[in-house]
Amino acid sequence: MTHQLHAYHMVKPSPWPLTGALSAFLLTSGLIMWFHFYSTALLTLGLLTNVLTMYQWWRDIIRESTYQGHHTTPVQKSLRYGMTLFIISEVFFFAGFFWAFYHSSLAPTPRLGCHWPPTGITPLNPLEVPLLNTSVLLASGVTITWAHHSLMNGNRKQTIQALLITILLGTYFTLVQISEYFEAPFTISDGIYGSTFFVATGFHGLHVIIGSTFLLICLIRQLFYHFTPSHHFGFEAAAWYWHFVDVIWLFLYISIYWWGS
């Protein structure tokens, strides 16, 4: 048995970043195949690879943090820095979509009819379904904060209740967003308006699904007594991510749904 004289976790070689990158490649390629050729084989393979990667990577992290005790205080501090940098990178990722939207909408070209929305586009009413979804996400932000405070106070029952409500709200948001896509009077192929609308809101919807999955894992871990008031970075990271998703949606709602209409 080896002994270490420092508090840092020396991570062993892991195949999951490689399989995660492979699954991302398969998913993007599969989406292209689905859009252009209506073939779902590559997309299904990408989804399967992604699910297997997530399961095994989460399994390893839970083993290292909960059962082997590798997530010491210095390690948790480094993980917080890493999560902060990841969220900052996501901010720049979405900044590109907002840039594309405002670049096109603030100075519309003659091809767009010199006005925004472009000629022939009927935008969605921001005071109907989009406002409902905004209320749902804001409510989920309240419930995830409730879950965090309950966990910090050692109230296991309320933590489980609040997490479950947050997951249900996230699922409801996703279902409403899907129904909105089906009922929208324009498509992703309807010029720059359709492209920016569906790509920006679609990637946000993907982040909601990822965040809901993250919170579902936290709920399962809470049921198995993995979290304590002083050791729950997995939950903390999920909560940060969920608040980030909330804030991005507010900017999307104000920019694309309200001002853009």
UniProtKB/Swiss-Prot annotation:
Q: Which GO terms describe its molecular function?
A: cytochrome-c oxidase activity
Tell me which Gene3D superfamilies the record gives. Answer: 1.10.287.70, Cytochrome c oxidase, subunit III, four-helix bundle
**Pfam families associated with the record:** COX3
Q: Which reaction does it catalyse?
A: 4 Fe(II)-[cytochrome c] + O2 + 8 H(+)(in) = 4 Fe(III)-[cytochrome c] + 2 H2O + 4 H(+)(out)
Q: How does it sit in the membrane?
A: Multi-pass membrane protein
Task: Pull one GO CC term from this UniProt entry.
Answer: mitochondrial inner membrane
Q: Its GO biological process terms?
A: mitochondrial electron transport, cytochrome c to oxygen; respiratory chain complex IV assembly
Q: Which domain of life is it from?
A: Eukaryota
Task: List localization entries.
Answer: Mitochondrion inner membrane
List where the protein spans the membrane: 16-34, 41-66, 73-105, 129-152, 156-183, 191-223, 233-256
Question: Would the keyword Mitochondrion turn up in this protein's UniProt record?
Answer: yes
**EC primary class:** translocase
- The keyword Cell wall biogenesis/degradation is annotated on this UniProt entry: no
Instruction: Write the Enzyme Commission number(s) for this entry.
Output: 7.1.1.9
> Which ranges sit in the Mitochondrial intermembrane compartment?
35-40, 106-128, 184-190, 257-261
UniProt topological domain (Mitochondrial matrix) ranges: 1-15, 67-72, 153-155, 224-232
What keywords were assigned to this record? Membrane, Mitochondrion, Mitochondrion inner membrane, Translocase, Transmembrane, Transmembrane helix
Q: What does this protein do?
A: Component of the cytochrome c oxidase, the last enzyme in the mitochondrial electron transport chain which drives oxidative phosphorylation. The respiratory chain contains 3 multisubunit complexes succinate dehydrogenase (complex II, CII), ubiquinol-cytochrome c oxidoreductase (cytochrome b-c1 complex, complex III, CIII) and cytochrome c oxidase (complex IV, CIV), that cooperate to transfer electrons derived from NADH and succinate to molecular oxygen, creating an electrochemical gradient over the inner membrane that drives transmembrane transport and the ATP synthase.
- Quaternary structure note: Component of the cytochrome c oxidase (complex IV, CIV), a multisubunit enzyme composed of 14 subunits. The complex is composed of a catalytic core of 3 subunits MT-CO1, MT-CO2 and MT-CO3, encoded in the mitochondrial DNA, and 11 supernumerary subunits COX4I, COX5A, COX5B, COX6A, COX6B, COX6C, COX7A, COX7B, COX7C, COX8 and NDUFA4, which are encoded in the nuclear genome.
- Which family does the UniProt entry place this protein in? Belongs to the cytochrome c oxidase subunit 3 family.
PANTHER family membership:
CYTOCHROME C OXIDASE SUBUNIT 3, CYTOCHROME C OXIDASE SUBUNIT III
- According to UniProt, the name of this protein is Cytochrome c oxidase subunit 3
Per the UniProt record, the source organism is Papio hamadryas (Hamadryas baboon)
Name of the encoding gene: MT-CO3
